[in-house]
Amino acid sequence: MQRIGVFVCHCGSNIAATVDVKKVVELAAKEPGVVHAEDYQYMCSEAGQAKIQEAIKEKNLTGVVVCSCSPRMHEATFRKAAERAGLNPYMVEIANIREHCSWIHKDMEEATKKAVILARAAIAKVNLNTPLQPGESRVTKRALIIGAVLPEFRQPWISQMQDMK
């Protein structure tokens, strides 16, 4: 079983105005493997990242779930913070409760229910994750085309493939 920390961001009022952040923390704390759960105004800030790093070290966390905004925006931020604290960065999962809950729901109860579901899904994923290691593979610049090619497209393909040699 993993030792998971769950961190729920208010994103100022972006999330907290529609999602009951305290309720998400309370229910996430009861999930299997969760040994730490807390909320903070801006998890992506230096202070927010420091909270994650402190919890990783103090609670010996093996996985982290951040309930915040889009992974596209801050997944790298949280993975780097976890890595600086000694945690494999691929043991960090993001539950996008801003775009998927607070921005699309007007009803706080519905938005909160959905945020809890997303948090639980991310926690379940971390419980099943294993640390990954980045690697490199050699790539051979070849292609095999199977099927008929229209005559007007044939010549450009052949010349491009000959250039690859």
Descriptions of predicted regions:
Residues M1-K165:
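Residues forming the flavin
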